[in-house]
């Protein structure tokens, strides 16, 4: 969620997500930005597709043949990630194999942390579009860069 807020991206959650949005533990996990998060929840993958007709979906998986950085992300595309424990169902991957992408990894590592994977791929898509609408320069708290 925090990565989506920082990137100005909408988070789409497809049930079952394994937690309740209003759970005390979720809020306690540092989600003080939750009120700034633009998110939607769908009952199923079919519900998601029906409510977002004609969309281009890239599916991030360790099983893909294409590297994420070799894709030209469209401005209005969606990037799908599966559950950290199981990934995206293989039936969906086979149906969408030309749009599956992976992050290269060394050796036989199973996968990266889900949040890290989202950040890597999302920020590549944003980079390709010049980080449009994002702050590209930070400010010091006590001093000025001009000193």
Regions found by a protein language model. Give the residues of each.
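Post-transcriptional modification and biogenesis factors for structured RNAs
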Residues: 1-147
């Amino acid at each position: 969620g925090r990565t989506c807020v920082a990137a100005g991206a909408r988070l789409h959650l497809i049930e079952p997500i394994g937690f309740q949005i209003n759970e005390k533990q979720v809020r306690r996990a540092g989600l003080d930005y939750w009120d700034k998060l633009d998110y939607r929840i769908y009952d199923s993958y079919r519900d998601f597709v029906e409510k977002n007709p004609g969309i281009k979906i890239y599916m991030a998986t360790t099983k893909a043949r294409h590297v994420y950085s070799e894709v030209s992300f469209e401005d209005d595309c969606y990037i799908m990630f599966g559950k950290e424990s199981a990934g995206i169902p293989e039936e969906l991957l086979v149906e969408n194999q030309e749009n599956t992408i992976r992050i290269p990894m060394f050796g036989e590592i199973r996968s990266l942390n889900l949040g890290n994977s989202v950040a890597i791929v999302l920020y590549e898509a944003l980079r390709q579009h010049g980080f449009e609408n994002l702050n590209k320069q930070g400010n010091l708290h006590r001093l000025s860069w001009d000193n």
